[in-house]
Amino acid sequence: MPTVSVKRDLLFQALGRTYTDEEFDELCFEFGLELDEITSEKQIISKEQGHGKAQGASDVVLYKIDVPANRYDLLCLEGLARGLQVFKERIKAPVYKRVMPKGDIQKLVITEETAKVRPFAVAAVLRNIKFTKDRYDSFIELQEKLHQNICRKRALVAIGTHDLDTLSGPFTYTAKRPSDIKFKPLNKTKEYTACELMNIYKTDNHLKHYLHIIESKPLYPVIYDSNGVVLSMPPIINGNHSKITVNTRNIFIECTGTDFTKAKIVLDIIVTMFSEHCENQFTVEAVEVVSPNGKSSTFPELPYRKEMVRADLINKKVGIRETPANLAKLLTRMCLKSEVIGDGNQIEVEIPPTRADVIHACDIVEDAAIAYGYNNIQMTLPKTYTIANQFPLNKLTELLRLDMAAAGFTEALTFALCSQEDIADKLGLDISATKAVHISNPKTAEFQVARTTLLPGLLKTIAANRKMPLPLKLFEISDVVVKDSGKDVGAKNYRHLCAVYYNKTPGFEIIHGLLDRIMQLLDVPPGEESGGYMIKASAGSAFFPGRCAEIFVGGQSIGKLGVLHPDVITKFELTMPCSSLEINIEPFL
């Protein structure tokens, strides 16, 4: 869930009253939000960087509020305050209007060169806006929140905002070779080519995460005005020429991307949130966008649509008994203007452009439940009685866990995600040979892939507990994930059992004995006949030569055991010998 930081006093001013922390926490809960933390800029810096860095930072109280990931209209103070005001029935939800300019309409022309890079673009103008320092900060913060959420870190959509008074339309959205693009980027004092900028931003903590989006493309997207001034090179950086400030009065907003629907949603959210500060409140000036095929469209769309939902459906799904009129009132409090029509059981719900999250009747039902109050819904016994039972795989896991502990091993619970190094380099494998499922744009280097083996997690656990008395005997029974083209999701989970023994001697006999005990518990006899188990000498990059065996049950390989190679032990920052066992337990079901 995204977290929005707002100044407490500024929020209370927008709400028209003050609250105690407990009262505001309760209000957030009623509205489907969560007050995550009460802090200040000084406390945040002190916590993250130390007390020395916090000198001179603001002591203004900040509320950190967790917002549902699909409620883009609540990602800034303006939307949050507006939503709460409507919820408390202090104001009515505003009506957003698109207006045509008094003079010529601004145009954004898209050329065919953008087709293979970022083919879509939409635009709008906020006219006669009045910024304060706080409003300006909120405007920038909203763009960043949208970039991180619906825009998927700018991969799907990138937002550019510009001081229209410094530019001259019509505007052209095209794509050129990096060496042919030269401009002065935001907050820089000299011009650079696109190639030079990509090299400079590789060390920029903020922008380096977005370079991969276009870095390998032969052409880079760029937006010019009629005088050849560069507005932006999406999704990387805006030009410094059209930089907006607190004194900016007219803003040209462009959204480019690979997802047309999301680009329109992002544009609608920005203009609906900040048209509140325009001279003519909640009005947005239209922009004509000309596609490569010559077709013209006008944006923003600001669509209002109507949905029909039956009152008895809402009552049944939520578990309440409310009249259609009361349900319509509840929905109106959630910025969904509603009225009872037809036979008295039908409710017509108007979906505003700020509520792109409402795509189905169930979304309307959910909002009715939130407005009614989850704590007000009476608990009832189900009409049918069922007997719960464990999945066979989970039952087998629980039985084995108990006996592994009885055998003197301690259970560890490790992360399902790990680094590529952990499952490949450190085990002497190439990453391509692991069939690992990779995480797109991982947050940290420690969580790049889903684990294909439980062994690295246990070895890292031992490394973190090296000062504990020897021997260390650990086990884990959990899932690993590998690619599988035969599955609809392209991957499959397998339940593995892994155990390690770490001591001054390898203790292969301990691990071998544990295997025998596991097979005894599973009623699998030794030997090749009658589906028995056996081990055969094998080789593995993670194991010491001549000290590795493959485990077979009924002729099927289920795993390996052996003494780990010294290189593996060293790479996991260990100093003592170690033996391990890892098997797939699903064949025993």
UniProtKB/Swiss-Prot annotation:
SUPFAM superfamilies (alphabetical): Class II aaRS and biotin synthetases, PheT/TilS domain, Putative DNA-binding domain
CDD domains in the record: PheRS_beta_core
Reaction equation(s) it catalyzes: tRNA(Phe) + L-phenylalanine + ATP = L-phenylalanyl-tRNA(Phe) + AMP + diphosphate + H(+)
EC number of this enzyme: 6.1.1.20
Domain B5: 302-379
Cofactor dependency: Mg(2+)
UniProt keyword Cell membrane, yes or no: no
Chain positions recorded as Mg(2+) binding sites: D357, D363, E366, D367
Xref: SMART domains: B3_4, B5
Places the protein is found: Cytoplasm
Keyword Ligase assigned: yes
Biological process (GO), any one: protein heterotetramerization
UniProt GO molecular function: ATP binding; magnesium ion binding; phenylalanine-tRNA ligase activity; RNA binding
Protein name: Phenylalanine--tRNA ligase beta subunit
Family: Belongs to the phenylalanyl-tRNA synthetase beta subunit family. Type 2 subfamily.
Record Pfam families: B3_4, B5, PhetRS_B1, tRNA_synthFbeta
Keywords on record: Aminoacyl-tRNA synthetase, ATP-binding, Cytoplasm, Ligase, Magnesium, Metal-binding, Nucleotide-binding, Protein biosynthesis
Quaternary state and interactors: Heterotetramer; dimer of two heterodimers formed by FARSA and FARSB.
GO cellular component annotations of the record: phenylalanine-tRNA ligase complex
Top-level enzyme category: ligase
